[in-house]
Every structure is written in C-alpha cells, then in structure tokens.
C-alpha cells in the first residue's frame, strides 16, 4: 500500500535529479496529487486553475511529524531529503521546516546518551550527526549558545561518525540510513569526506539489477536461527534434514557448520557503535550489524536446540561444535539479555534505559523471545545464573501482564500490517507471546492468566476463511496464519489446558487453520511473502523466507497434535493429510 513516507521520499528523489521533474512530469504530478489529497492544500497553492494541487511545505511537514510523533528519528530524515531536493522551497529559509538535531550531544561520553533523552533512537547516532550538521550548515540556530556548541563540535562529531562507520560503508547494512547520512554530508559541503565516499561505495555495490535497492541487504543470522527453531518443531533428528547438496554447501555436517557459523557471529568485544557489551548477536554476519535482543535470543535458542539434537543422536566428536564452547557462548548470550532487561521487566531492542521513544522501549515480542531463550538454558549451572534467569522471567511476565491489551492481544515492535488499525500486528505479537507462555507455565503460574486472554484473542481474530491477517478482518496471509496456528497448536498440546480456553473451539480453529495453510502449500502459494516486516521510519519490507519458515514451524507443531485433531471413528478420513 502507498503511504506518505515512501511517496514523499519518491517525490523528493525526482526533485533531486536535474530535469527529472519535466522528463517524468506525469509521475511527479500523480505523486503530488496523491500527497495533496491526503495532507491537504490551500486554494492559492495551485499553479494555475488547470494544474494539480501543489503540496505546500507546511501541510507536508505537519503530516510527516504527525505520523511519527515526538520521535525525530524518522520525520527529520524524510524532511531533510525533501529540503535537499528543493521540495520545501528554495534558499536557506526552506530549512526552517526541518527541526534542528543537537548533533553536538554526540560529542558527549556515550554513557550519558540514555540520560540526555536524545530526540532520536539509540541506533540513529549517524543520522543525528549527519542530518544535524546539514541543518546547521544551511540554517544555523538563532540561539548563540547552540550555534557556538555546534560550531565547536562539528569536526569532533564528524570524526566520531567516521569511527562508527563499518568497514562495508553501510550503517546497519541498510540503504535508507546510509543514504540519509550520505546525502546530508554531500549537501553540507562534505561530498568528498571519507564517510561519504565509503557510503557511496556501499550503495553502489548493493544496487540490484533492476536499478532498485532493498531496505535491508542481509538477514542471514535471523533467518538461520528462525529456520533451526522451525526444524525443532518437527521432533525428528535434525540429521534427517540433509542431502548431498546440503552437505556440499556446508562442507560436511550441516549442524556442525551452522553451530560454528553462529559461534563466529557472536560479538566478543564492545560494539563501537552502540557500545553494547560482548555476548550478543546481530541480524547479519556483515560488519554493519548491531547486537540486538531478538537475534541474541534466536541464536541462544538455536544453540540449545542443536545441542539437544546432538545429544539425542549420541554424536561422536565432529557431530557438532564442542559442548563447552556452545555452553560458554550460550551463557554469554543469556547474560547479555539479562543485562539488557529494563527496569519495567521488558526487553528493548538495542540498549537498556533508552525508554523515551517507542523504538527504544521494552516490547512484548522481544520479551517473549528472551523468555524462551532463558528457559532453554534454565537448568544449566551455575546456581546463581539459574536464580537470575528465574527472576528475569518473573519480571518479564509482569511486564507482559502490564502491556497486554484489554482484548488479550500484544503488539510487537518490529512487525506490522498495513491493513490493520495503526498499522499494528497483534497477530504476530500475540502468537509470539502465547508460544512463550506455553513453555513458561510449568514453572511460572502467572503465565496461565495471560495465556487464557492471549489464546482467546487469537481464536477470536481468525478470519472466516480459516486464516489470519495482522488483526481481525485483515486479509489472511501465509505468515500470520502460520504464526497463529503454531501458537494455538502449542496451546492444544498442553496436557492441562488452562480453564477458560474452550478445547472444542481450539481444536476446530487449529483444524481450519491447518487446512487453510495446507491448501496454500499444495497450490504453491505458500512461498509468496507479505510485507509484514517493519523497518525504521514505518517503511515496510518482506522476507522471502518468512512464509516458508513460519509454515514449516506451524505444520511441525500441528503434527505433534495430529492424533487429537483426528475425527472419532475407525472409518473417519484423515483430516490433515500432508501435515
């Protein structure tokens, strides 16, 4: 679906290229009409009676800021792009529409950042520096103290920007953030700066054959750990998932290859960018990654699952990475997550204590993932670590109780749905939390209260066709149906289903969802991705492997309860053939 962020950026791109407005007049006009229809315009803003409405800077700025609220991480880069492209007027006065970013604060010790309540999120330091400098270059602050501070820290913050730029040149290995930095530097007299040159090189190398760029270039760590998690649901030896092709690609035993690869991705030193402590994992194996909660939890879980598979298969040496090495890596990851936990009991993405802005706050899906990771290693010594894990899970459950909606749902942070109210995705969030609660309830009684409301929320949000969308009545998708189905099948597998969840309805819903998903598998539609990924600045992405991974996880979980789903009677047909 079209949205104001991408349309404004696309419209600005045509303005930035000399002659593009005239050469592609029809495209530019349609974009202006779309924007004007959604943000409003004044009658005198028409060029002539027969022309399309003109997008006025005040209306555009108001709409962009309203979309993102007080978080300047997203609104200011978009408006800076518009200013650099001449879409907010001409001359330095066009920059009055771009709120200044206090880039001078980047010169402070990094330990101060959380307390300073920066107007951008923890991972946006490059944007704070580069975009802040662009605004200062074109329209310095009227405040003499701020103007002097920015003048004095300009070189120092540029040096910091160079220090935190990864060797690939791409900040977070992401096109949008890197582009915002490059264009801001180039537009403020720094076109030949080393950061600019390395950023341009990254963008040149990452352009696709059709001339476009992907939002993210590499999610290798994330999709690998998600795949291992999905395979674990099948409850058969992982060694069975092999072939000559797989062994050839892995250079031998594929489990050993993945274990070794994951161990090499763990950060062994403080991260130069966010100053995260050692022990975490990023979403990618490329140098621009930053350790985060979701990927660290995913890696810790994957190591536990493969270690369990090795043990069950009674492998000799060479079947996997040494047990001691895996245990040490897992403990480091567990402690990294424990140290990341906020005072509210929830888990944020990158940094502890940066709770002023939404993308730095604790979130339900990240907290649920951390709970699963902690539970996977909760019985490992030493005793003091076990005690910390128990306390952390209890705190995380209290956080989940606090943020659960009245309808029983939870909202995730990094996933959304364009067809749902507020572009949220309660299906993703609720499914992830319900799956974690099914595992936590054996030790933590509080989980059952949350589980009843969460499970019933998933039951109530199923569509009439048997599938799920991002929320009730949103179009059903492979990803969301698989996520909901996996969670409900895990619920159905419980020997003592919590009172308040109707078993008959649960069984029928799982059966309907299974049929919906199997129909898509058999037709080949199960490989078609949906843009449920939520990137910074409310930009959307899809991942080709999501529907396949989530479907595998869901059907593996359903297979565990297949006997319960089978109809009564010796002559009954098998209802979920193929699952």
Put a short name on every predicted segment.
Residues 164, 249, 312:
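Conserved small-residue-rich
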Residues 573-579:
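Long, low-complexity, intrinsically disordered segments
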Residues 243-244:
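Generic detector of N-terminal low-structure segments
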Residues 1-29, 33, 37-46, 53-142, ...:
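An alpha-helical repeat/solenoid feature that recognizes helix-turn-helix modules
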């Amino acid at each position: 679906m079209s949205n104001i962020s991408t349309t404004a950026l696309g419209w600005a791109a045509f303005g930035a290229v000399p002659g593009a407005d005239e050469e592609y007049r029809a495209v530019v006009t349609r974009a202006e009409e779309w924007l004007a229809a959604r943000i409003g315009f004044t009658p005198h803003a028409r060029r002539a009676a027969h022309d399309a409405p003109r997008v006025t800077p005040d209306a555009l700025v108001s709409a962009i800021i309203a979309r993102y609220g007080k978080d300047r991480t997203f609104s200011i880069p978009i408006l800076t792009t518009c200013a650099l492209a001449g879409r907010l007027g001409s001359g330095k006065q066009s920059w009055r529409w771009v709120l200044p970013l206090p880039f001078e604060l980047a010169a402070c010790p990094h330990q101060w950042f959380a307390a300073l309540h920066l107007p951008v999120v923890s991972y946006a330091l490059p944007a704070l520096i580069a975009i802040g400098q662009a605004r200062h270059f074109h329209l310095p602050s009227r405040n003499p103290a701020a103007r002097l501070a920015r003048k004095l820290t300009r070189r120092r913050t540029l040096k910091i920007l160079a220090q935190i730029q990864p060797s690939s040149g791409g900040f977070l290995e992401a096109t949008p953030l890197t582009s915002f930095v490059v264009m801001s530097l180039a537009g403020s007299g720094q076109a030949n700066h080393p950061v600019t040159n390395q950023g341009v090189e990254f963008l040149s190398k990452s352009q696709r054959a059709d001339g476009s760029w992907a939002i993210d270039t590499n999610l290798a760590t994330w999709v690998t750990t998600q795949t291992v998690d999905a395979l674990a649901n099948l409850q058969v030896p992982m060694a069975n998932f092999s072939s000559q092709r797989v062994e050839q690609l892995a250079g031998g035993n594929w489990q050993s290859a993945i274990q070794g690869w994951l161990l090499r991705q763990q950060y062994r030193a403080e991260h130069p960018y966010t100053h995260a402590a050692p022990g975490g994992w990023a979403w990618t194996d490329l140098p621009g990654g930053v350790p985060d909660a979701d990927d660290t939890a995913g890696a810790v879980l994957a190591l536990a699952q493969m270690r369990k598979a090795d043990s069950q298969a009674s492998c000799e040496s060479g079947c996997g990475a040494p047990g001691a090495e895996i245990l040490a890596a897992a403990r480091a990851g567990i402690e990294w997550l424990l140290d990341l936990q906020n005072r509210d009991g929830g888990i944020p993405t990158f940094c502890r204590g940066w709770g002023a802005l939404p993308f730095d706050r604790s979130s339900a899906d990240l907290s649920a993932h951390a709970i699963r990771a902690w539970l996977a290693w909760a019985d490992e010594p030493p005793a003091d670590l076990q005690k910390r894990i128990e306390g952390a899970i209890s705190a995380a459950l209290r956080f989940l109780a606090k943020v659960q909606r009245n309808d029983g749902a939870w909202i995730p942070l990094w996933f959304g749905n364009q067809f749902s109210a507020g572009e949220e995705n309660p299906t993703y969030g609720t499914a992830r939390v319900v799956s974690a609660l099914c595992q936590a309830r054996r030790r933590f009684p509080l989980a059952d209260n949350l589980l009843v409301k969460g499970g019933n929320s998933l039951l109530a949000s199923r569509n009439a066709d048997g599938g799920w969308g991002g929320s009730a009545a949103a179009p059903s998708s492979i990803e969301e149906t698989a996520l909901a189905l996996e969670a409900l099948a895990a619920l159905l597998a419980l020997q003592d289903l919590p009172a308040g969840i109707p078993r008959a309805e649960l069984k029928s819903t799982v059966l309907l969802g299974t049929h919906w998903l199997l129909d898509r598998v058999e037709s080949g539609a199960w490989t078609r991705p949906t843009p449920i990924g939520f990137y910074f600045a409310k930009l959307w992405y899809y991942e080709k492997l999501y529907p396949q991974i989530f479907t595998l996880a869901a059907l593996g979980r359903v297979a565990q309860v297949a006997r319960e789903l089978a109809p009564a009677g010796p002559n009954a047909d098998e209802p979920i053939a193929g699952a």
